[in-house]
Amino acid sequence: MIALIQRVSSASVTVEGNIIGEIDKGLLILLGVEQGDDEQKATRLCERVLGYRIFADDDGKMNLNVRQAGGNVLVVSQFTLVADTQRGMRPGFSRGADPSEADRLYQYFVEQCREQGVHTETGQFAADMKVALVNDGPVTFWLQT
């Protein structure tokens, strides 16, 4: 399971012209689910993402996690994160989880975020989404379990 996390001042996701998820300060989490991923990996990745210290403390050092910084999260499914890009000019997606399993684990990840007490907004699994963000920094990290 892969999470591309971006520290944002704001972010939103739109489907068919309607904003379905929106946050101010926090993390935009683009989530990719691979074959072999399970609830244990999703739980571990959620703990890492929510505990990752990428917000500035009073001394300006990256020393606070999203909870300590009073931030929110917006979780958006993105199967292209699991693409095989090693050869050729076209990505392959054979490493991606079956769509029904990917959706289940995506929803599980979202619930884990909520159970950790973080306000969590979402995109819509498998929809054509428009994601807007103001990247703060920019600060972007790739986490994988």
Swiss-Prot record:
Output the SUPFAM superfamilies linked to this UniProt entry: DTD-like
Q: Does the keyword DNA-binding apply?
A: no
EC number(s): the record gives 3.1.1.96
List where the motif Gly-cisPro motif, important for rejection of L-amino acids lies.
137-138
Which segments does the entry list as coiled coil? none
Instruction: Tell me which InterPro entries the record gives.
Output: Daa-tRNA_deacyls_DTD, DTD-like_sf
The EC class name is: hydrolase
> What are the recorded Gene Ontology BP terms?
D-amino acid catabolic process
Q: Which compartment or compartments is the protein found in?
A: Cytoplasm
The terms under GO molecular function for this entry are: D-tyrosyl-tRNA(Tyr) deacylase activity; Gly-tRNA(Ala) deacylase activity; Ser(Gly)-tRNA(Ala) hydrolase activity; tRNA binding
Q: From the record, give the cysteines joined by S-S bonds.
A: none
Query: What Pfam families would the database entry show?
Result: Tyr_Deacylase
Which Gene Ontology cellular component terms are annotated?
cytoplasm
Annotated catalysed reactions: glycyl-tRNA(Ala) + H2O = tRNA(Ala) + glycine + H(+); a D-aminoacyl-tRNA + H2O = a tRNA + a D-alpha-amino acid + H(+)
The UniProt entry, under Gene3D superfamilies, shows:
D-tyrosyl-tRNA(Tyr) deacylase
Residues making up the signal peptide according to the UniProt record = none
Describe, as the record does, how this protein assembles with itself and its partners.
Homodimer.
Name the PANTHER family on file.
Answer: D-AMINOACYL-TRNA DEACYLASE 1, D-TYROSYL-TRNA TYR DEACYLASE
Q: What is known of its domains?
A: A Gly-cisPro motif from one monomer fits into the active site of the other monomer to allow specific chiral rejection of L-amino acids.
Task: Specify the protein name.
Answer: D-aminoacyl-tRNA deacylase
Top-level taxonomy: Bacteria, Pseudomonadati, Pseudomonadota, Gammaproteobacteria, Enterobacterales
